[in-house]
């Protein structure tokens, strides 16, 4: 894969830029908010990032439901975890008071794309299986995946040194070779694997920024974990770095952020993109468009990803809504997806859209898609539609008793 070079979202560690962040993020995820934009911060989503079962943590909050806050983005910094080598975004948010909502400025325009022909970030992702870290002393990947990222082998029958840096710039020299139609990394791989304490489902991301005719760009490796580590890493390779924060400390960060948000105080959250649709800092426009949806049980929907503001959405699998939770905002839809989709059955209402049958006969004009500035939000909160004998409310009407005044 290749991604066009782009500037940092803000000052960060200096190595991780927007391209590297997106490469390390879950596929079709990892959207970063623009500085100055208006977003919703979902506490439940923040907790779910660190806890497989977040309910006990949420019960400790002194914040009443639905635990969602309107904020402006003060800063976005891209960093790498000092020990786990995960890329993450540090997002600083300013809560918006109810009386300030009408005076909010429009969202800033998306940053222009980088000019073509410059440096490209080429990368590939390998999701690790048990055999990759329990038995093998070497890493292997299909040659087709590694092409354009790993350099060509000088001698296909011999190994050669390959310098790879982690996301902090620390170098590792692997024995780079070939076995059949696969490339292999040995020597340092076992130590790197043991120090990272990988589990089944974790991923490694190899990245190289290079010109089209240059094979000498620096090679980096990042990590995407399936879930937060529940115990400290052994830390044998990086003795000078701090130990992994225990689960309790990570959970304290969620509680502190929720407390600051409720008090109207500036706070900072760390966002690690680990699975599709896990963003808990969501653009206001996306949430409000979802609030206009009219969904019922058994309604057919399709999942929609929006990786970058201003980019066309990516449409995912279809499914049917089987339940709509009335006591929560985060992942309040239960959906059975078609086929063998591995999508989470719980989805957020702004991540799906109804599948509608459109009459394309010449006598029927195409439906008009309103721009954000054309939508009368007060009308959308009060209008319902006929569904046979049933009045189908908007999502906003379903949730207006739960959501704060400033939503």
From Swiss-Prot:
Record-annotated DNA-binding residue ranges: 124-227
GO biological process, one term: response to hormone
Domain of life: Eukaryota
PROSITE patterns: B3 (PS50863)
Pfam families: B3 (PF02362)
Signal peptide bounds: none
Gene Ontology molecular-function annotations: DNA binding
Keyword Secreted listed: no
CDD domains: B3_DNA
An example Gene Ontology CC term for this record: nucleus
Keywords assigned: DNA-binding, Nucleus, Transcription, Transcription regulation
SUPFAM superfamilies: DNA-binding pseudobarrel domain
Location within or outside the cell: Nucleus
Protein name: B3 domain-containing protein Os07g0183200
